[in-house]
Amino acid sequence: MDNIILRCDNNINGIFTAIYDAFVYKNQMQKENHEVYRDNISIEIGIGGNYTLFSKMIDIETDEVKVQKTILTIQKKLGFKIYETVFDALCHYSDNRATIVLGFLVRAFKVGQRIMEYMTDKYVMEVFELSRKVNKEADKIRGFIRFSDNGNYLLAHFEPKCDMIPVVMWHFVDRYPGENFVIYDDRRRYAVVHPRLKECFYINESEFCLLYTSDAADDKA
């Protein structure tokens, strides 16, 4: 079988899309070659990676339908607890996290929830280790994040090692359901916005700067 590298956007939805496509290519390769899959599909996160000799590089476009199908399949076949472990592992900063999770899911879909008994497998062990480290940092962050009153909303800045916004934001949604608040990740340059009593949404750096500038202008008016 040829080696395939799937290159995806550097965010959780980009990775879930790549995982979906990885299984499509895996099944196609097995059907065409009648061979056992040998972990020869990897996922590269972000732009600017190095091409590998004798490997096929495929750029993956983030697809919300594929994202939801992947999430629902993991939850249905493996349970919500294992889904949370996978999600947390994907929020780690390791460049290999997507490939590690792919290897884990290939094995998990074969044995179901019994995958937790296979801790000697390197992919299983690494997924749980990544998840553990993310949760350790999340526990610290929940305790030290502080909001400042920005007039129209509460604002918090932080610079975590791991991608913490998707992990910790629900803690603050539960804590401040009636508040407008924004949490901005200075390292990854994006934010989550929580309008009071409404659903959260993400904004990028330019959108955050526009929000911040607009709010500052309102204060001066």
Model-derived features: positions:
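Single conserved hydrophobic/aromatic residue that forms the stacking wall/gate
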Residues: 212-221
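N-terminal ordered "arm"
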Residues: 1-62
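Charged, alpha-helical interface segments at or near domain boundaries
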Residues: 47, 54-138
